[in-house]
Amino acid sequence: MNELATPDNPLRIGTRASPLAMAQAHMAAAALIAAHGLAMAALEIVPMTATGDRIQDRALAEVGGKALWTRELDAALDAGTIDVAVHSLKDVETLRDARFFLGAMLERADPRDRLVVREGIAAQKISELPHGARLGTSSPRRAAQVRRLRPDLDTVLLRGNVATRLAKLAAGEADATLLAAAGLERLGMHDIGAVQGTELLLPAASQGAIGIECRADDAATIALLAAIDHAPTHRAVAAERALLAVLGGDCRSPVAAYAEWQADGVLRLDAEIFSEDGADHVAGHVIVTDAGVVAALGHRLLAEAPPSIRRLFAT
């Protein structure tokens, strides 16, 4: 047993303070308890408010990008005030500081999006939304995908945690929005929204995946986390994130990437990159055998992309 994970010296699990982040931290704690036979008192959940949770009236790209979700947790982990940090991997920068180590990923939940509409609108699919409807999102990927499918729709900024976005929707700030199915499920909102197929809305890289980081020099905690790592999820998500690294995109880049294990045991990676207005897009897929295959896909997508897309990626 890790000497940290005792009632007298509990393993401190850092997390954002939002309801979804707290639910995910409790999932990580439950996995550690089950894997190591720990007492509940051997773990301590340490919530903190991320900068991204405080700023909700502007797009991420205007105020610092994905680092807004990790800055406080990174500082606490580096300072030793927490031992591990639990993240929604979709919100974590592609290139991480070498001081931190991604020690585990929990088994991935449903990676798809759900379409949620306000009262008075009957739509199960994006194609069924009324002409000119306002679809709220802060995601460049979702905005570009929606604009490609329905150029008539008005995409408007809608930020905040799940409850905040649902409240804004109910208040009429938008007619519809797209939310991650995994987040809704983890919050117990099983009946909210209609799932959208990946053939229409390919997910964001890492969507539905929970990652747990520790300090790279903390061998004991690395060993503790290894027992709860879901290897198939880790390999699939690593492929998606490797593609992002090749593309050089940031939080302003409309990119979708999803690696899925096939019935014959191979891992297929699908990816799409878009112009901001969704009018231009390039798609491709590979069977993942090694890092070189993923890199080749990224380079091919960029080579085939028109200037309207390439300018959104740091090549």
Swiss-Prot record:
One of its GO terms (molecular function) is hydroxymethylbilane synthase activity. The modification S-(dipyrrolylmethanemethyl)cysteine is found at residue 251. Binds 1 dipyrromethane group covalently. It catalyses: 4 porphobilinogen + H2O = hydroxymethylbilane + 4 NH4(+). It comes from the Bacteria. InterPro entries: HemC, Porphobilin_deaminase_cofac_BS, Porphobilin_deaminase_N, Porphobilinogen_deaminase_C, Porphobilinogen_deaminase_C_sf. SUPFAM superfamilies: Periplasmic binding protein-like II, Porphobilinogen deaminase (hydroxymethylbilane synthase), C-terminal domain. Its EC number is 2.5.1.61. Pathway: Porphyrin-containing compound metabolism; protoporphyrin-IX biosynthesis; coproporphyrinogen-III from 5-aminolevulinate: step 2/4. Tetrapolymerization of the monopyrrole PBG into the hydroxymethylbilane pre-uroporphyrinogen in several discrete steps. Belongs to the HMBS family. The porphobilinogen subunits are added to the dipyrromethane group. Monomer. This is Porphobilinogen deaminase. The gene is hemC.
